[in-house]
């Protein structure tokens, strides 16, 4: 399971700066749910050989009045559900009453916590950080998030114990930037073979009360207990093995666990972190939407995270029975308008309560998974790449035409196509989108996003046949070239 790292601290200690650096800024806001998360942000990070979800909890300005009264409920939830807490302090401002209050709360929760003294650039760091040892949370790590100094080491120190305990293998590829990482055809082949031997992991997600539990029970064909009061039950999703028509699945049920803080509270408690972890651990995501409410901002936020995670996707519009035809037409129009950016995903209109349309979901789930894991040869990908060039040439960059040489598979689930050539890193985003759509149409990819990676370099097969032509072969070649030229003149 992918670890979750929560950034905690009072305002203006550098949490947002660290968050943007960890998530590389360009895809920092992968899941921002207005009205639900308030000042909390979620992002995917890859650093020091580890992949993890990072959560910016927002600032805590409470001091002597008590941490519980000043910390937002969502920030409390982030601490509860995080695997590792990074407690950021300001080395220049020194220890404050707010820092002491936060430390007291963290000690009471017994969370794995690391104290990080930020903004150590340009000062005597050791002297400035000495007082933070009095927080009683162990070693104090020095960092300058704005300059990036100490960030990688801090992540490695904080995640290594958790990774060792959970059996997570550190990636030793030496490159933490997904865009710069070398994707090899051999690795893709191994990944494709590995996926063929595993059951399909299906995550059922959606905002509260859209019918996820009802749909899960309908799929399983049995009633399941969905309310638990034992400590820790809100932490992780439930994994349910099942088999359907000879194919093995693992349902990742994010709605099967609820928490009742009060006896009369029956509304499902929505855990964003639990949902995001389920998405990361899945092969296919089934997003459930309430037909009566239409597309909500939370739905769009979840879709953003699914796309960034590269997971195959099927959409189920639930509670379709019993609504008027004019309402159905309005919902379909809204879906077309607001979900145009995921036109590759199948949309089903179902009733989980009565079972209408539920059986057809698995046809699309299998189709999406097969598209995400189907092996494609280098020759086919290179041919499609050449066809895309013939239809629309790459633009000029600094007066020179970008030259695309060959393409190969770089991974599966999601399908990754690696394009090699000269100046490919300078291709404009518009041409990259054109190529991505061209590959999607040509490969008939349904139900899964497709990713393109561009790498500088020549054809690996160049120079293999360096044997010099004989005199007779050279003469024959000249005659052939002359014949072709004469034919073209005619």
Curated annotation (Swiss-Prot):
Stretches assigned to the EngA-type G domain: 3-166, 200-373
Protein name: GTPase Der
PROSITE patterns per record: G_ENGA
Domain KH-like: 374-458
GO annotation, biological process: ribosome biogenesis
Residues that bind GTP 1: 9-16, 56-60, 118-121
Pfam families attached to this UniProt entry: KH_dom-like, MMR_HSR1
Annotated HAMAP family: GTPase_Der
Subunit comment: Associates with the 50S ribosomal subunit.
A GO term for molecular function: GTP binding
Source organism of this protein record: Shewanella halifaxensis (strain HAW-EB4)
């Amino acid at each position: 399971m992918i670890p979750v790292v929560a950034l905690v601290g009072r305002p203006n200690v550098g949490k947002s700066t660290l968050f943007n650096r960890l998530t590389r800024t360009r895809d920092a806001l992968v899941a921002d749910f207005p009205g639900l998360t308030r000042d909390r942000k979620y992002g995917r990070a890859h650093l020091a050989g580890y992949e993890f979800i990072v959560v910016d909890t927002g600032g805590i300005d409470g001091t002597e009045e008590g941490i519980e009264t000043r910390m937002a409920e969502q920030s409390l939830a982030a601490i509860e559900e995080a695997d590792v807490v990074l407690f950021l302090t300001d080395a220049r401002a020194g220890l404050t009453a707010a820092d002491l209050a936060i430390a007291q709360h963290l000690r009471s929760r017994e969370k794995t916590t690391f104290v990080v003294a930020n903004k150590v650039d340009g000062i005597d760091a050791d002297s400035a950080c000495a007082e933070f040892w009095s927080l009683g949370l162990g070693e104090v790590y020095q960092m300058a998030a704005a300059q990036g100094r100490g960030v990688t080491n801090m992540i490695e120190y904080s995640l290594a114990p958790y990774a060792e305990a959970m059996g997570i293998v550190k990636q030793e590829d030496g490159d933490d930037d997904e865009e710069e990482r070398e994707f090899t055809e051999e690795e893709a082949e191994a990944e494709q073979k590995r996926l063929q031997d595993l059951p399909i992991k299906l995550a059922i997600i959606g905002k509260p009360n859209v019918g996820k539990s009802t749909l899960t029970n309908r799929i399983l064909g049995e009633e399941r207990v969905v309310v638990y009061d034992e400590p820790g039950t809100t932490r992780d999703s439930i994994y349910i093995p099942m088999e359907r028509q000879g194919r093995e699945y693992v349902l990742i049920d994010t709605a099967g666990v609820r928490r009742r803080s009060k006896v009369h509270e029956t509304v499902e408690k929505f855990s964003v972190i639990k949902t995001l972890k389920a998405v990361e651990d899945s092969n296919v995501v089934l997003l459930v939407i309430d037909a009566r409410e239409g597309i909500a901002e939370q739905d769009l936020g979840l879709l953003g995270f699914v796309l960034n995670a590269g997971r195959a996707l099927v959409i189920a519009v639930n509670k379709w029975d019993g609504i008027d035809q004019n309402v159905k037409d309005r919902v379909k129009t809204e879906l077309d308008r607001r979900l145009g950016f995921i036109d590759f995903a199948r949309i089903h209109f179902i009733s989980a309560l009565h079972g209408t349309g539920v059986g057809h979901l698995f046809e699309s789930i299998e189709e999406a998974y097969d598209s995400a894991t189907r092996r494609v040869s280098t020759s086919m990908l290179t041919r499609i790449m050449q066809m895309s060039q013939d239809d629309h040439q790459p633009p000029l960059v600094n007066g020179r035409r970008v030259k695309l040489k060959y393409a190969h598979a770089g991974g599966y689930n999601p399908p990754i196509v690696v394009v090699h050539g000269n100046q490919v890193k300078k291709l404009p985003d518009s041409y990259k989108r054109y190529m991505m759509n061209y590959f999607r149409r040509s490969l008939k990819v349904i139900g899964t996003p497709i990713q393109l990676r561009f790498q500088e370099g020549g054809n690996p097969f160049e120079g293999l046949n360096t044997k010099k032509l004989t005199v007779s072969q050279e003469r024959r070649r000249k005659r052939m070239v002359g014949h072709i030229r004469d034919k073209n003149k005619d």
